[in-house]
């Protein structure tokens, strides 16, 4: 049993000893006697373990002795007794930092990392601990862990310029140039004068230029995929250069990556500055080409509606590109919107009238429109569509065959024959011609048809249509029109000056035979073209073909008279198919030279008077040129050689007619014949060959085509309506003077224009 007195003495002496150890330890701290200080504080804590301050004092002594582990143990013990004291926590974190830094300097990066991580856990808001952890991870080459730690710091909003630069270097190491560039931009925003950021940025720009050069080389070599990888690397190193996106867009367009190509071009256009107008134009052009190629891709895969939408975008920005209209017209054609397709093809032809592809497509479209109208029995409209197709593609025989069938329904037999003859001219072995040949040319072979006069006329029309081509269908540009007008004015001035100087002219009359015209060309060393020639050359034959008055000799007669339609078919004469009027004037009578207006009036007058109605087969023509009818003898033809009408001029003198009894047409012909006789006498004098022989003219006029004047052997045929006109060789030049004939002709032209409607009505009533 313990003495109570002794217990009381022990209890009173323990606090005194603790106080004594405390004073001695504190004195040693002041004297920097770290070991004795640790000894005294340890004795005091042995007497009373709950003295928290003594742990802190002993930890300070251990810190000075660089015994960080012991210091950490004492600080943790103190913090465990008083968790709310932040001073203990801050001191503990500081000791951990010192320990980690010492380990880092000793290259013990793994232990240093563990220490820094402990300090960072104690004070997460302290960025210095995280930075030291990053350094340890980099030293350990744990780049992914370091990048994750940096990303965590950036997300927490504690990133600085150094942090961005550190992560940029990591991205550059991982070849993530795009992210590297972004971090450099962020670092420069925080510190515009950061030297390391500027240096690294310049390095990336140089890498981008090198990648662009490599991509260009590979693209030229045809290695498009590798070139695309290089240009992607260039964009990652310098994503603010619009040239890189433009180049990548072109590569993607070649690889048919149209969506990405459009994005690149749009991005390049957004990134350009005011000084890069050329790049903007190139990007717009490439964007249009991308839309067009994308539309073609959709067209090939049957997505016609999508192709139309893409081409609408392209045409909205570029209205002068014919290829866009052609492609959109193809899409409309496949969708069945023929009206829209026709409008697009017309627009393309207006931009380029000679474009072969546009003309070919227009021909196919017009053919389909013609089939649609023909199906609805609208043969007149179908004929117009087929004629339009022929104007665009005159060498396609199927168009002529389709139009010939339409003209058969319209009872235009002559036009159908011309079309069939044209088909044989273009392709003599064209299939499916037997039925049409039997209908329009019965009992005739292909060779006979090709030798006929209808074939000659069809050949003439075909050659003119091919020569003219589609260039006259659509209006020319303003510049071309002005150039043509200027040249025409220069030619007119030159001709006017030559007329003032008295330059002789040798011209051929309206109804002179082609053989005589060729002989005159051989005799004439230098021939001058009249002003009306240019007008006649510019006319192009339309859907209604015309007939030329072709004179034949002897056995060569027109085969078009052997087969006649049972209906009344209107036969029209066009100015383009008539022989060109050329009138000669001697030098002594220059004041009587016909002006171009008079010549043109004569031509138009004759064209209007040339329209006649072909009677039915076997019927008699009842038309009358004068009040007294002319007797005729007609019989049914026995063979094709007897079906032609021959007009002969009588050898004996003709009974003279007064001017009052002559009709208007006969008076015009007579006046022209007088002038032609004067020209002929002049030609005979120059050649010094005066011969007088009775002329026998065989001419096929517009009235002869529509009638059947066949004579039996042994009978003399009555003169036809064409024979009633005066022959050039039988009229004396003394009947009318040149001046009187010219004035009379001028007056008659004026009267004829006014009397033509009445005469036509009169003829119609007589029929």
Swiss-Prot record:
InterPro entries: TPR-like_helical_dom_sf (IPR011990), TPR_rpt (IPR019734). TPR repeats lie at residues 18-51, 53-85, 93-126, 128-155, 208-241, 242-275, 288-321, 322-355, 363-396. The keyword Transferase does not apply. Residues 684-718 have a biased composition (Polar residues). Residues 612-733 are annotated as: Disordered. Pfam families: TPR_8. Disulfide bonds: none annotated. Keywords: Repeat, TPR repeat. Coiled coil: none annotated. It comes from the Eukaryota. This is Tetratricopeptide repeat protein 16. The gene is Ttc16.
